[in-house]
Every structure is written in C-alpha cells, then in structure tokens.
Amino acid sequence: GKATSRTYIFTAAVKTQTEHPGGSWPTNSVNGQRIDLPMDINIVEDNRYKNLMESALLDIPTISVSTDPDNLFGSQSGIYVNAENHGSEWERPANIELINPDGSPGFNIDAGIRIRGGWSRHDNYPKHAFRFFFRKEYGEGKLNFPLFGDEGTNEFDKIDLRTSQNYSWANGG
C-alpha cells in the first residue's frame, strides 16, 4: 500500500532535545554502541548561534525515518546497535520522508533500511550512515522523485545517506 506516515518537526523542541528524549529511545548504550542524541549545548547556547538555530534547522531539507524502535535499537536485531553486520538479513522496513523547508512536496515512501559504510560502522562512532532500498516488497518498488532537480535521474533503486566521519567531531576533527 501507499505510505501514510506524516512527520512534524517542532524546531524549538529539536533545539532543546535532551539526552533522553523518552519513549522507546535508548537511555544509554546498547551492545557498546555509543548513543549521542542531544543537541550540543555549547552550540545551542553560544551567543553567535543561539538566535540562528531554529531558522538554520529549516535551511535544508529533512529526511525523516520512521520504523519500529527495535529495528534500530533492539539488542539482538537492531541495525544501529549491531552496525558492523552486513547484508540483506540486516535490512529492516522503514518509512522515509523528504520534508522540504519551503513547504513544496517531498516524498513519502516505504523502503528497506540498512547501515552503510566501512569504519564508521564501529560502535565508537555515534552516528551511522544509512542506505535506503526501494523494492516492491516494501511498496512502490522504486523512488520516483526529482531529488536533484533538473540534474540527473528521477528514478532510484537505492539512496545512501552519508555521515562523512572524516575530520568530524566524532573523529576528533
């Protein structure tokens, strides 16, 4: 069937996101995986940035991933806390939304999700990259969307969402 999830982003709440957002989010590490959920208070409260934070959260599109929390954080089967595992047996169903800050239509599609990457799969890295797979078993089979505007294709079998760990805060950079 057609994907039906709908995500709402409240920028004031994102800005003040704590270490323990509640619900099914983990309250500490799972399987040794470092979990880093809060916004960095040193940036959020910095006089140079604090008045820009909410508008900055709306400057670029947002990708929203909705799935059963166990698909990510379950100690035995969660892909995020078992990130070094590879292959189709480590793919989980999810709903993926593209939310454009200007209100123009994005996309909303059911897909498979895996962890991607090499060294960044290690549990010392708190942010992992995702790969989304668009297949008939999840719904439409392909993503048909002008993701890059007039440049390139509008049809996708998969998309990678990279984290760029080199020279990042997570890698001492």
Residue ranges and their predicted role:
Residues K2-G173:
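Phosphate-handling architecture centered on phosphoinositide signaling
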